[in-house]
Amino acid sequence: MRRFSTIVDLLISKKPSSQANSRIDLICKRFHISRVLNNDFVESTERKNGVGLVCPEKHEDEFAGEVEKIYRILRNHHSRVPKLELALNESGIDLRPGLIIRVLSRCGDAGNLGYRFFLWATKQPGYFHSYEVCKSMVMILSKMRQFGAVWGLIEEMRKTNPELIEPELFVVLMRRFASANMVKKAVEVLDEMPKYGLEPDEYVFGCLLDALCKNGSVKEASKVFEDMREKFPPNLRYFTSLLYGWCREGKLMEAKEVLVQMKEAGLEPDIVVFTNLLSGYAHAGKMADAYDLMNDMRKRGFEPNVNCYTVLIQALCRTEKRMDEAMRVFVEMERYGCEADIVTYTALISGFCKWGMIDKGYSVLDDMRKKGVMPSQVTYMQIMVAHEKKEQFEECLELIEKMKRRGCHPDLLIYNVVIRLACKLGEVKEAVRLWNEMEANGLSPGVDTFVIMINGFTSQGFLIEACNHFKEMVSRGIFSAPQYGTLKSLLNNLVRDDKLEMAKDVWSCISNKTSSCELNVSAWTIWIHALYAKGHVKEACSYCLDMMEMDLMPQPNTYAKLMKGLNKLYNRTIAAEITEKVVKMASEREMSFKMYKKKGEEDLIEKAKPKGNKEGKKKGTDHQRYKGRGERSRAKAL
């Protein structure tokens, strides 16, 4: 395990690899009807202005004090490894697996913080990572898309502690491949398992099908299922996975074909199969078929359960005109003695809030509490989003306080909503207060939270604070794939306000060798165009040359802009250098330089035209085209 720090140091600095995939999801042995509502139903040194990043306060449990102590050390020294290791060595921390896991969890999306701590712990005498710690680290690395490092860790586990390698690691790996739509790699995990002393069984294969079907690859899952029929004989679990996948995509004919295959295999559908089919009908808008299926279920001796009613209510809540029908289904459910649970109530609240009926949402909220069903953060989230749409900031704050009084503490998603609204309304100090409160409650901001704050600071002119948060986000390893909208807005505002050095500092933090950010042509184009727009032509050209050193060819309009700017400066030397490299790159890519150059010039001319003139010209052209034709020929042309 000691060699792992060397292996990962080599891998972590590279771009994410497609040869090794992540394994973040915990093993879920229940295969179908995920009852968590989807997106359809949920639609950073203090400054004199009170703006800045703060350290969180303590949690009250066994590890609380040490966790926050370590987290503060990581926050303060993560960009300077020698100082970080010295501070950790002098901290007097008693390492044990439970503490390591808590620290990794505390780091949240800040993968670099957890990674640095894991490496430091690896080097400590007398300490050895447990299976749970290694699995947690695998989750963090895979979430950072450092897949080479993930494989490096597993390989090191095989050499030093092979008994720590369990099938669940590979199940998580398959799920991460599936979520990235890398079906071939997901299937290849089955072939890799024997190399680590494990043989894939029916459970592992079932997890593979389940992962593919839940991530939109049901067609590929069907092929894998057919190809491996002999090795893994069909069972009800496999068919249920395929049925779920087809129903989720709204392909009911294929779903019915799965039912036929199921019967041919001598298998009878159970309540889960019926619920999946019911969900398929409901979300395809075929409510009459869904109701008929409910009646058929009763005839077959399957009394619809809360899952069945909930999928109907969720589907009905998608349409404003069918909210009354959703309530009728809810009443019918109670009439049949089926008690609604938190997901059912949340679906109703989500529907009312989605269509602006917040008062009815609160009414359902009160009703569920009276019946002993305690709302969750997801439930409150529906109402919070509705208040955000109406820009009701005070109501959001009141709801947060109400949640706290009821023992349901706001999660990261809820803070994101309220902070976003505060920034939108110009309440930057309130946004910072909420940020500080969030971190004090032990919540680590993710990329969404950082982006919200950065955009809020930028829009209100707090550019120094925006830069600080941006650099903090990058240093925590959260910004591995640039959010181009945020990057463009920040760089453009800095250059526009003549803060060129600050802009260069921002760019350097994502382009240096230690950064895990993925920089492509789009990111470089944003930076080069921002410099050019403010008249910094030579700097733009310098960065363009840097980009080409990385074997990235500038876009045609970027080349055309730089040539135009250099022509005005009478700087033929730099123009010749850039042109020579572009010609060479075009040749290597079997492109015509003349066509490339012409395309760039045409793009500049097109962008220089006022939009109104272009539309007017287009209309005039159409008028001339059809002038003098008869109605029949004009209709034919259209």
From Swiss-Prot:
Q: Where is this region: Disordered?
A: 604-638
> What are the PPR repeat spans here?
130-164, 166-200, 201-231, 235-269, 270-304, 305-340, 341-375, 376-410, 411-445, 446-480, 483-513, 520-554
Q: Which PROSITE patterns match?
A: PPR
RNA-binding recorded as keyword: no
Task: State the InterPro entries in the record.
Answer: Pentatricopeptide_rpt, PPR-containing_protein, TPR-like_helical_dom_sf
Task: Enumerate the UniProt keywords alphabetically.
Answer: Repeat
Q: List the disulfide bonds.
A: none
Transmembrane segment boundaries: none
Coiled-coil annotated residue ranges, if any: none
Which Gene3D superfamilies does the entry link to? Tetratricopeptide repeat domain
Query: Is Repeat among this UniProt entry's keywords?
Result: yes
Family, per entry: Belongs to the PPR family. P subfamily.
- Protein name (record): Pentatricopeptide repeat-containing protein At3g49730
